[in-house]
Swiss-Prot record:
Upper classification of the organism: Bacteria, Bacillati, Bacillota, Bacilli, Lactobacillales
Protein's recorded name: PTS-dependent dihydroxyacetone kinase, ADP-binding subunit DhaL
Location in or out of the cell: Cytoplasm
Enzyme class: transferase
Residues in the signal sequence: none
Domain DhaL: 5-189
Induction: Induced by dihydroxyacetone via the DhaQ-DhaS complex.
Amino acid sequence: MLTIDTTIEWLGKFNEKIQENKAYLSELDGPIGDGDHGANMARGMSETMKALEVSNFGNVSEIFKKVAMTLMSKVGGASGPLYGSAFLAMSKTAIETLDTSELIYAGLEAIQKRGKAQVGEKTMVDIWSAFLNDLQTDSASKDNLEKVVKASAGLLATKGRASYLGERSIGHIDPGTQSSAYLFETLLEVVA
């Protein structure tokens, strides 16, 4: 279960993972997007960490709300609104429960509502849904996350910028799926 300290630790680890993989995320985004997913996420998480360092929080909900507001205002493209919506929904859920499955469910619902995407459309919904299922069946692991990331390459994009490529979107890993994998890998490191 998340606490104030473990939540901040999780976000710090996620930031490190994003910074380390900034170029790779943008490389993934190049063929099927604007090529800026890594730069956008790195900037957003850097700003998020700055915001967390200068704030005092009474609960996990307040942390998630700060993350949401920062990502929505600092991350360009679709990633800011999608991740921001997820963290905002998680902040509302965290008022009632800190159950990891419930938090991820809230985030997934918000992403689906914002992006109007379903499972199988080569979006971050695929990995959020798979991770939620794994949490609910006590089978969440880094290996399972990596399988979902790799499987995204075989999907036809029907949402977002990648959908403009049609069949040419097949064969490319979805960058939002990869960045979400980093989010969940680092969560597992903290709550395991």
